UniProtKB/Swiss-Prot annotation:
Pfam families recorded: Ribosomal_L20
Organism of origin: Salinispora tropica (strain ATCC BAA-916 / DSM 44818 / JCM 13857 / NBRC 105044 / CNB-440)
GO BP annotations, alphabetical order: ribosomal large subunit assembly; translation
GO molecular function: rRNA binding; structural constituent of ribosome
Name assigned to this protein: Large ribosomal subunit protein bL20
Protein task: Binds directly to 23S ribosomal RNA and is necessary for the in vitro assembly process of the 50S ribosomal subunit. It is not involved in the protein synthesizing functions of that subunit.
Residues spanning the membrane: none
Entry similarity comment: Belongs to the bacterial ribosomal protein bL20 family.
Amino acid sequence: MARVKRAVNAQKKRRTLLATASGYRGQRSRLYRKAKEQVLHSMQYSYRDRRDRKGDFRQLWIQRINAGARANGLTYNRLIQGLKLAGIEVDRKILADLAVNDAAAFAAIVEKARAAVAEEGTGGAAAQAA
C-alpha cells in the first residue's frame, strides 16, 4: 500500500482557518489552536445572534411606535388594540418607519385607531345598559 503524505492538505486546512481568523486580535489570528477555538466560538455566536436579531428589531420597532403614539396622545397597547378593531393590518416594521419618516401618515393612523377604541368603549357601555 502506498504511503500517504498529508502535508499539503494539512497546510491548506491551517491556512484557510487562519485566513478566517484574520481580523482577530493577538494570538487568535496567528496561532492555529487559538484561532481554531475562536473561529468555532465565532460561528456559534453568529448562529445565535442571527436568531436574536429578529427579536431585537421587533423591540426597536415597538419602541419607535410607542414614542410616536405617545406624541399623538395614545399608548402603544391602545394603538395596537385600535388598529385591530379598525381592521387596519399594518405590521410593526411599517408602523415604525411611518412614525420616524412620515409623521402625518402615522398621525392619521393613530386617529383611526383612537376612533375605533372610543367607538368600542361606548358601544360596550350601551350594550350593557340595554
